[in-house]
């Protein structure tokens, strides 16, 4: 029996970065939007699997609650919408992003955060579908781990990021499934 070598974080980042660079230019904006929509649906399904009672519970020390994940995805969705739309519509240079955990505001509800994400995504999609696919590809902005990307790479990164957090939500739902029985 052979042991599979576990990928280091650096190797994972390099693999994802290579995927983003090649696929963002190979796919049309419509195809990129479709992949984001599919990822968003997976995220919604995973989020719905977390019970209301478990929504703000941290599964294990040092991990995120479902509320924290949802707030983070909302923050990054707002960033994607502002940044990508700003480039496409105005040729505006976005600021770099530091993709880090932030705790969910105590008053934020699941419904409000989901509605905000939906609003950001719909505006982003509407602008992307009207965009010249070759416009402003020289404008790049950075992610603290994945480096500088143009708007098409950022759009595909939104898919990767959303799927990553969909898997995180699934793990939270599984870890906290006995929570309701307590």
Feature map (PLM): residue ranges:
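Acidic/histidine-rich alpha-helical segments that form the ligand environment
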Residues: 35-40, 44, 100-138, 156-158
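Short low-complexity stretches enriched in small and charged residues
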Residues: 22-29, 34-36, 79-82, 120-123
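Short, contiguous alpha-helical
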Residues: 2-15, 19-21, 56-98, 138-182
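A short, mixed-charge helix-start or loop-turn motif at secondary-structure junctions
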Residues: 22-29, 102-110, 144-151
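Short, contiguous, helix-prone interaction/anchoring segments in small proteins
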Residues: 26-60
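Amphipathic, non-membrane alpha-helical segments in soluble helical-bundle scaffolds
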Residues: 26-36, 63-70, 110-117, 152-155
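Structural signal for well-ordered, non-membrane alpha-helices
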Residues: 40-48, 78-81, 85, 118-132, ...
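Short acidic/polar alpha-helix capping motifs at helix-coil junctions
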Residues: 6-10, 16-22, 31-34, 46-47, ...
């Amino acid at each position: 029996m052979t042991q599979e070598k576990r990928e280091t974080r650096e190797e994972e980042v390099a693999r994802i970065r290579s995927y983003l660079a090649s696929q963002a230019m190979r796919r049309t904006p419509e195809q990129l939007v479709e992949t984001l929509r599919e990822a968003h649906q997976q995220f919604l399904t995973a989020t719905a699997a977390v019970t209301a009672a478990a929504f703000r519970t941290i599964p294990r020390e040092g991990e995120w609650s479902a509320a924290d994940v949802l707030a983070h995805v909302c923050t990054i969705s707002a960033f994607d919408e502002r940044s990508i739309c700003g480039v496409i519509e105005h040729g505006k240079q976005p600021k770099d992003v530091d993709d880090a955990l932030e705790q969910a505001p105590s008053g934020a509800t699941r419904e409000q955060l989901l509605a905000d994400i939906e609003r950001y995504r719909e505006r982003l999609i509407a602008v992307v579908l009207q965009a010249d696919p070759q416009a402003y590809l020289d404008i790049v902005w950075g992610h603290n781990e994945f480096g500088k990307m143009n708007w098409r790479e950022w759009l595909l990164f939104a898919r990767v990021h959303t799927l990553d957090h969909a898997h995180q939500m699934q793990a939270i739902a599984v870890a906290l499934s006995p929570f309701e029985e307590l």
